[in-house]
């Protein structure tokens, strides 16, 4: 089924003799694989009038979609999507060439007053409005054992918590290396 995908690179199904390919060394920044300068057109220059449209011809001869549709064909979804959302006023028909209805004209007053922005959450480092009771803090400190923090030795980076087995308070197993 996928045998055609597992062919060796450069293998052609058509049994046509081909010239051996040679790889060109990288020529530098201004060239594409040494074949042509970048931006240079391939082949002879096209006749005038076909520069922008290539082999499709002029835009009059190539139209990918029909210009007119029968009434009611495929526009029900577009009509529902084109209805203005609540809170937005549709643009008057005279404003077709004017500013976008989503952006107010400079110097014009907004038709609907804007609600005030929601309050920002308190930033880190700000004091809360509620003060915490000092007794609650000390009881929490005692409960968690944080009052002993000043008694513990400082641990520096690169040091292990226990330098020797004697720090553990138990006898090491027989045959182990001690400090």
From Swiss-Prot:
Region (Disordered): 23-122
Name of this protein: Cbp/p300-interacting transactivator 4
Gene: Cited4
Predominant subcellular localization, coarse grouping: nucleus
Annotated function: Acts as a transcriptional coactivator for TFAP2/AP-2. Enhances estrogen-dependent transactivation mediated by estrogen receptors. May function as an inhibitor of transactivation by HIF1A by disrupting HIF1A interaction with CREBBP. May be involved in regulation of gene expression during development and differentiation of blood cells, endothelial cells and mammary epithelial cells.
Localization, UniProt: Nucleus; Cytoplasm
Gene3D superfamilies in UniProt: 6.10.140.2200
GO MF, one annotated term: transcription coactivator activity
